[in-house]
Regions:
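An acidic-aromatic pocket/loop used at catalytic or ligand-binding sites
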Residues: 2-6, 21-134
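Sec-dependent N-terminal signal peptides
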Residues: 6-13
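C-terminal motif of bacterial Sec signal peptides marking the signal peptidase cleavage site
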Residues: 17-19
Length: 134
């Protein structure tokens, strides 16, 4: 690996390691713009799925980053509630991490947060009914 590739890798890792969970959020996907994702998380396209039909849109969106899980869970709750989502329940276990469940105008959202060996993962599972034109 060349010096510049190593240097680039170090810069990327350092920026991810110093990312703050309370940084301004960015939208997840255009279909789910009211579900913010804190900066410092990278979208994992190969682990994610988006399903669209005439009646429903659903998604399983996976992100990862190097953010402390407790501050990430708090940031997720704060930003989601700021976007009108109502927290229905929240559970934390040592084995399975944190699960947060939200609802908003008949739409549902489940947030799973867990720690892997190197990264903290966030899985957003959302569904919403499509507005049918008449």
């Amino acid at each position: 690996m060349s010096f510049f590739h190593r240097l680039s890798a170090v810069v990327v890792i350092a920026s991810l390691a110093t990312a703050c969970a309370s940084a301004p959020p960015r939208p997840v996907r255009s279909e789910f713009e009211d579900i913010p994702v804190p900066k410092g998380l990278t979208y994992e396209a190969d682990r994610s799925t988006i399903i669209e039909s005439p009646q429903v849109k659903a998604a399983r969106l996976v992100y990862r980053g190097r953010i402390e899980i407790e501050s990430l869970a708090a940031a997720m709750r704060t930003t989601l509630e700021g976007n009108g989502w109502r927290n229905v329940s929240s559970t934390t276990t040592a084995r399975h991490g944190t699960t947060q469940v939200y609802e908003k105008a008949g739409n549902s959202l489940q947030v799973l947060l867990w720690e892997g060996l190197w990264y903290t993962y966030v899985e957003l599972t959302a569904s919403r009914a499509s507005q049918l034109s008449r």
